[in-house]
Amino acid sequence: MITKPIKNVARKKRHAHVRRTITGTPERPRLNVFRSSKHIYAQLIDDVNGVTVAAASSLDKELKLENGGNVEAAKKVGELVAKRALEKGYKTIVFDRGGYVYHGRVASLADAAREAGLQF
């Protein structure tokens, strides 16, 4: 019997492989992206101390989004997480795409964060 591969299992495998090399430090935290079908989430993580430094998602009340699962929502989340990171004094980060393809919502979040002032 042929079984269809599950996309999320393959994504988690890719993410685990990348996480062996990418770590966030107190000076340069890791910008992690999680994408669901209805929303997108981004958080800056200091892996040395195990602390989330800043976070933003399409569920935030500040954004007042009707649809959190599109490219425009990802762009606004990228701007918001960059604003929160800059307020806390972080300018350079490490981008962690979470095993997702750098395309669509993930790419627009990254581009918006770059345009808002984060360097990666």
Swiss-Prot record:
Keyword flag Hydrolase: no
Signal sequence interval, chain numbering: none
UniProtKB keywords: Ribonucleoprotein, Ribosomal protein, RNA-binding, rRNA-binding
One MF annotation (Gene Ontology) recorded for this entry: structural constituent of ribosome
PANTHER family recorded: 39S RIBOSOMAL PROTEIN L18, MITOCHONDRIAL, LARGE RIBOSOMAL SUBUNIT PROTEIN UL18M
Similarity annotation: Belongs to the universal ribosomal protein uL18 family.
Entry function: This is one of the proteins that bind and probably mediate the attachment of the 5S RNA into the large ribosomal subunit, where it forms part of the central protuberance.
Annotated protein name in UniProt: Large ribosomal subunit protein uL18
Gene: rplR
